[in-house]
Amino acid sequence: MCSLRLLLSDSYDPWFNLSLEEYIYKNIPKKQSILFLWRNQNTVVIGRAQNAWKECNTRRMERDGIKLARRNSGGGAVFHDLGNTCFTFISTQEHYDKSISSNIVLNGLSYIGIKAIISGRNDIVIRTENGEHRKISGSAYRETSGRKFHHGTLLLHVDIDKLDYYLNPDFKKLETKGITSIRSRVANLNELKPGINHQEVCLGLTEAFFQHYGMKVKPEILSTDNFCKIPEFFKQFNKQSDWNWNFGSAPAFTHQLDTRFDWGSVTLHCDIERGIIHRSHIFTDSLDPSPLEILAKKLVGIPYNNKSILCCCKEWMQSWPQYKKELSEVSHWLIKTIS
């Protein structure tokens, strides 16, 4: 006999929700199936093997207060806001696979009057009025030690402009070994059903979940108050919210950037591993390359973010007061470009 749980998060914090998801996954008992429903506010979520700098515009995100969250599953980068419903199916049933949860999602949408189909391995699509298939859901699957995990998103009324705005990185010369997101043509469910909301979708998914298992359970509301004192959860949350996980876990990559100032051209070549600059070289045709050669050495060993670059440049500029204007231009350029 399989037991069921229906879990609802009252938090919009992506680090909390992803930590909660991981905690539930690691602690689910045998012969249990769980549906966890949640939402994130203004977040870019990237896959476990992705490079944040390649997938999204980190400078815009930092300026606008958009969080970055790296999940523990694979897949591509997605933008979340409150027009997005997240679902997670977790099970320790012996014969469980993602086709079960995928069909629950399709049936849940059908209950609220939306016809959708599976496309490829991980996507759910709808057919628009002009006959075009558009993606409304992407998902990822993982399995370890008898525990199965399938999570994904449903686009209800996501701000598509923000999706494009934050998921389009700056034009940078990046070479990376990470997994690159494949941009798909997406659609919001409110194009088919105006006024659709999170509560309505959750009711549809819940009904399909109960229908599949032939039983009903009361929903459990999960909040930060329930979990903040649990050491295992707290450890997971610290990891999930840490720069070293969200940015530093990126695969090794190379960043080359160049520009021209009135006094000469500058090309910076950096090799980054786990979010740290491991090698740096600057090429320039300036009449005195010495300050830039010193800067290249100072960049080695610091985190690849604009705060660290700013601290490095401030210290560096103090050693060359005679070049204050030129070095200020270089500093401003680096801080603006590396973010």
From Swiss-Prot:
Protein's cellular compartments: Cytoplasm
UniProtKB keywords: ATP-binding, Cytoplasm, Ligase, Nucleotide-binding
Catalyses which reaction(s): L-lysyl-[lipoyl-carrier protein] + (R)-lipoate + ATP = N(6)-[(R)-lipoyl]-L-lysyl-[lipoyl-carrier protein] + AMP + diphosphate + H(+)
One GO process term, biological-process aspect: protein modification process
EC number: 6.3.1.20
Gene Ontology terms, MF aspect: ATP binding; lipoate-protein ligase activity; lipoyltransferase activity
Recorded metabolic or biological pathway in which this protein acts: Protein modification; protein lipoylation via exogenous pathway; protein N(6)-(lipoyl)lysine from lipoate: step 1/2; Protein modification; protein lipoylation via exogenous pathway; protein N(6)-(lipoyl)lysine from lipoate: step 2/2
Statement: the UniProt record of this protein carries the keyword Glycosyltransferase: no
Pfam families for this protein: Lip_prot_lig_C, LplA-B_cat
Domain BPL/LPL catalytic: residue ranges: 29-217
InterPro entries linked to this entry: aa-tRNA-synth_II/BPL/LPL, BPL_LPL_catalytic, Lipoate_ligase_A, Lipoate_protein_ligase_C, LipoylTrfase_LipoateP_Ligase
Enzymatic class: ligase
Residues that bind (R)-lipoate: K135
Binding of ATP, residues: R71, G76, A77, V78, F79, K135
NCBIfam families hit by this protein: lipoyltrans
Cross-referenced HAMAP family: LplA
Assembly: Monomer.
Additional comment: In the transfer reaction, the free carboxyl group of lipoic acid is attached via an amide linkage to the epsilon-amino group of a specific lysine residue of lipoyl domains of lipoate-dependent enzymes.
Protein name: Lipoate-protein ligase A
Source taxonomy: Bacteria, Pseudomonadati, Pseudomonadota, Gammaproteobacteria, Enterobacterales
Gene behind the chain: lplA
